[in-house]
Amino acid sequence: MISLDSLRSLVTGLGTSKDKGASASYYFQPLGPDELNAMHRGDWLAQKVIDIIPNDMTREWRNWQAKQPQIEKIEAVEKAPLINLQVKVNLALKMARLHGGSVIYIGIKGTVDLSEPLDPRSIGRGDLAYLHVLSRYEVTCGETVTDVTSEFYGQPSYYEVAGANGAPVQIHPSRVVRFVGAPVLDRRSVGNDPWGDSVLQAVYDAVRNAGSAQGHIAALIPEAKVDIIHMPGLGEFTKTEAGRAKLTARFTYANTMKSMLNAVLLDGTGGAGKDAGGEKWEQKQISFAQLPELLQSYLSIASAAADIPATRMLSQSPKGLNATGDSDMRNHYDNCTARQGTELSPALNRLDEVILRSALGSRPAAIYYEWAPLWGLTEKEQAEVFKMKADGARALAGAKGGPLLPVNALSDALVNTFTEDGSLPGLEAAIEEHGTLADQPETESANENTEQPESGEEGEEGQPTRRAANDAKPRPLYVSRKLINGREFLKWAKEQGFAKTLKADDLHVTITYSREAVDWMAMGQSWGGEDGKLTVPAGGARLVEPLGDEGAVVLLFNSSELAWRHMGMREAGASWDHPEYQPHVTITYEVGDVDLSQVEPYRGKLVFGPEVFEEIDECWAENLNET
């Protein structure tokens, strides 16, 4: 006796032979190549189902992890006109998804017998000549390899293509890169066919229903408004040819009058109810209220069937309060990234060996690649990531204690990181010119070898040089940078109507004002140029606003360098009296009659001198001079 655990109802017939779904079953009807081609070429939804995932999988391509000269040689081979690997892989993936399979033929210079296996170890520099993409219908497959000890198990024993003069040529499976569309899991059902199904096979009904719904809704548009005319004795007119001619002439004339005078001419009394007589005219309109939701449902089903989010498939904005679509796109890109690892990388393994040997003449074991991220970061997110990497490296280098890693090794790793992610354009060329951190000559401590002028003596640019602290005793700290192009800045201020301004020598930007005592030596150093200067480029967001309770009027501006430097000192123990840090230059403490809302902010570049470390002067305001 067989017992089935299922829900049944003898009253409604659910789960019994009376169930309306009892006779339903699945059947498989393969789509032919002609219909698949017609769908891809003639239906926008089917075309997107085929093209979107290959386009996203190959859009950012991959990053080789090797020395820069090696990377340049490898990429030169990949981008050669007859190879163009990224484009060829994209095309092969589309063909495989459309027809169920495709191959990329690997053309090697000097090959005589294509039926012989391709040994990547025999490839020399420049031996890779070209790559050709062929669909499953352009090649004939030999018997499927059934030997489980063979590396080509489950693949054709050979591929046959048309050669010169149409003569068939057999190609060993090691000489092609094989792509399969939707894999057939039960190989017994396909016999000797080594290919998969088209991805359109499983989504056919969903795509067709979405297209049909769109077409039917479009067909309703001409019927949105229909004129209905009631005519007494209409049947009598249609009995004879003369009557039908009179009927046609009657309504032709009525329609002409409607077009000329925007009026409907009818024969009748115009009365209502019992008094009604003669012809009657009315309009019927079709309601489209629920049709957009219905069409959207069909399109959403098609998107789900294709495993592509609607925001990507339909190029539409996400719906819902505070919806951004980021989660949908992240899931989509995660899917593409997973496919890169499970579909592309294994398929390209042998070809990659050929590319490396053709580019370098050998196969260094340390070289590998990583798929480039598909999710792009905004400029703000990139800056935040850059800061986190820099802060992490500073922590590993021992900002507050001993280093956790060898500093030179950490520097080399950081240079490679910033080069690969493009955070610092031109870094690689600069390293080649100036050398790495390990290449720099060791310098003795400035505190031990630099003679300091006595207190009160003037240093460069006539500025009093402060005595350096020769110990690491914690003390309050004030760090600033002088504005070098102060005269240009003050010229702008005078043009804007400021009668009194700070002197050029007093113009500066504050980086740190720590009332808490800190170890000055733990503050690190700035990332400016060799001369210690920092230039904030012209333009960008700038405002002239009052600041604080002292009547100061300042120019607010943005500088990632200053912000990161400030945060680095905060993390090293410096205090700050305000909720956040905003770089600014004080213009004046006496605004006078100037209407700040009418002031045009200074747009030129700001050039600041080296950082100045000094103790906090609580009487700093008494030393300010305005002119």
From Swiss-Prot:
Binding of 3',3'-cUAMP, residues: 105, 614, 620
Further comment found in the protein's record: This homolog of an antiviral immune evasion nuclease may be due to cryptic prophages, or it may play a role in regulating the endogenous antiviral defense system based on cyclic nucleotides.
Record-given protein name: Anti-CBASS protein Acb1
Protein role: Counteracts or regulates the endogenous CBASS antiviral defense system. Phosphodiesterase that enables metal-independent hydrolysis of the host cyclic di- and trinucleotide CBASS signals such as 3'3'-cGAMP, 3'3'cUA, and 3'3'3'-cAAA.
Record-listed 3',3'-cGAMP binding positions: 105, 614, 620
Organism: Caulobacter sp. (strain RHG1)
Catalytic residue list: 508, 510, 584, 586
Keyword Glycosyltransferase recorded: no
Catalytic activity as recorded in UniProt: 3',3'-cUAMP + H2O = U[3'-5']pAp[3'] + H(+); 3',3',3'-c-tri-AMP + H2O = A[3'-5']pA[3'-5']pAp[3'] + H(+); 3',3',3'-cAAG + H2O = G[3'-5']pA[3'-5']pAp[3'] + H(+); 3',3',3'-cAAG + H2O = A[3'-5']pG[3'-5']pAp[3'] + H(+)
A molecular-function term among this protein's GO annotations: hydrolase activity
Region named Disordered: 437-474
Sequence similarity: Belongs to the anti-CBASS protein Acb1 family.
